[in-house]
Structure formats: C-alpha cells, structure tokens
C-alpha cells in the first residue's frame, strides 16, 4: 500500500502544484536573503559601527551551550533507540532529492545578477526601424493628443457645470429666489377667496354693535 502511494503522490496534479510553489518559495527565499546580505551587510556603512553591548558574559553563553549540547544529545539518543514502525519507501528520484538545493543555487545566481544589474547601468540598443512608428510618425499628433484632449475637456466641462449648478444656482441667488417664490405662492393660495368672508364678518360685527347701542 505504501509502495503504491509514492508514484500516485509524484504524478498527482495537486501535489505537483504544491511542489512547484514550494520550490518557487525556496528560490525567492534564497534570492531576497542573498540580496539583503549583499546590500546591507556587505556594503560600506555611512556611520562608524558602534558596539553597545557585550555578549561574552559566561552567564549568557553557558546556558545556551548546555541547551545546544543537550538538544543534540537527546535527538541522537531518540533517533537511535526509537525506530519507526514502518520503513518509509525511498523511491524518490535524484532530481526530486536535489530540487531544493538546485532552486537555492538558482535563487543565489539570480540575486547576484540583480545586484550586478543594480550597480551596472546598461543602455538598450536603439533600433532605427522603430523610430518612425513609435516616436514621431503618427502616435503623438493623432492618438495621444486626441484622446487626452477629449478626456480633459469633458472632465473640465462636467466639473464647471456641476459647480455652477450647485453653488451659483441651487445654493446661491437663484436658489433663494426659488425658495421665496414658493413661500409667496403658498401664502397667496391660503388667502385666496376669503375676502368676502372677511368683509361679511366685518359688516355683521358693525351691525351688531349698532343694534346694541340703540
């Protein structure tokens, strides 16, 4: 069962994708580690180095030494006296075993090349056949200026119209005028047709006062 499991793991698409991502992560880790080492530790410092602490104290180094020796000894004893229940199949090919170290070496080479390109300026070789079509042939006067000009003009018109409509009309004098006209119309409609009732009540009040005095 375990012998038949190894080929299925090596040939499955999911496991292949996981292995590829792992190898890419290994290469990237080696790349940025080497670049960090070259750019930070291998260069000249701008300020003189200053050591502000002393790590040669035996009270610090002795516990770390005992911990390291104890871990090495305990690991050797455990792996020597406790054997696995089933022997794992050793059917990995050579390229699979050495893939991690190969990707690490590839990442180191890539980091060194990037560092060399950072400190060395390379000029691209000009191609005279591309000068007419890319520089002054038709791109700038026909395409670049046309679309940019139309886009900027539309944005300017929209912005100006919105500012004029919102601040100068709706919230400015025209907005106040519309508000006052609406209030005047509402007040006028409330008093429309009531003049007869007012005159009638006034005349009736005068008549009652005359009758009461006589």
Curated annotation (Swiss-Prot):
UniProt-annotated location(s): Mitochondrion inner membrane
GO molecular function, one term: NADH dehydrogenase (ubiquinone) activity
Transmembrane intervals: 14-34, 58-78, 92-112, 192-212
Main location, first listed in the record: mitochondrion
Gene Ontology CC: mitochondrial inner membrane
Keyword entries, A-Z: Electron transport, Membrane, Mitochondrion, Mitochondrion inner membrane, NAD, Respiratory chain, Translocase, Transmembrane, Transmembrane helix, Transport, Ubiquinone
InterPro entries: NADH_DH_su5_C (IPR010934), NU5C-like (IPR003945)
Swiss-Prot/TrEMBL catalytic activity: a ubiquinone + NADH + 5 H(+)(in) = a ubiquinol + NAD(+) + 4 H(+)(out)
E.C. numbers: 7.1.1.2
GO biological process: ATP synthesis coupled electron transport; electron transport coupled proton transport
Membrane topology: Multi-pass membrane protein
Listed PANTHER family: NADH-UBIQUINONE OXIDOREDUCTASE CHAIN 5 (PTHR42829:SF2)
Function, as annotated: Core subunit of the mitochondrial membrane respiratory chain NADH dehydrogenase (Complex I) that is believed to belong to the minimal assembly required for catalysis. Complex I functions in the transfer of electrons from NADH to the respiratory chain. The immediate electron acceptor for the enzyme is believed to be ubiquinone.
Family assignment from sequence similarity: Belongs to the complex I subunit 5 family.
Name assigned to this protein: NADH-ubiquinone oxidoreductase chain 5
């Amino acid at each position: 069962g375990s012998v038949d499991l190894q080929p299925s793991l090596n040939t499955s698409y999911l496991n292949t994708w996981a292995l590829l991502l792992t190898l890419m992560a290994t290469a990237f880790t080696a790349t940025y580690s080497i670049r960090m080492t070259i750019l930070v530790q291998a260069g000249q410092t701008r300020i003189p180095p200053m050591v502000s602490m002393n790590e040669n104290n035996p009270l610090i180094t002795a516990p770390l030494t005992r911990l390291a020796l104890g871990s090495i000894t305990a690991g050797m004893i455990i792996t020597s006296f406790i054997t696995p229940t089933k022997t794992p199949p050793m059917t990995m090919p050579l390229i699979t075993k050495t893939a991690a170290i190969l990707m690490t070496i590839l990442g180191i080479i890539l980091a060194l090349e990037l560092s060399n390109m950072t400190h060395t300026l390379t000029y691209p070789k000009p191609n005279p056949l591309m000068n007419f079509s890319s520089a002054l042939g038709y791109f700038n006067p026909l395409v670049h200026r046309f679309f940019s000009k139309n886009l900027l003009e539309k944005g300017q018109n929209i912005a100006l119209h919105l500012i004029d409509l919102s601040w100068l009309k709706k919230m400015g004098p025209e907005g106040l005028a519309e508000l006052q006209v609406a209030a005047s119309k509402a007040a006028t409609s409330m008093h429309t047709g009531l003049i007869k009732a007012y005159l009638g009540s006034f005349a009736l009040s005068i008549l009652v006062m005359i009758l009461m005095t006589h």
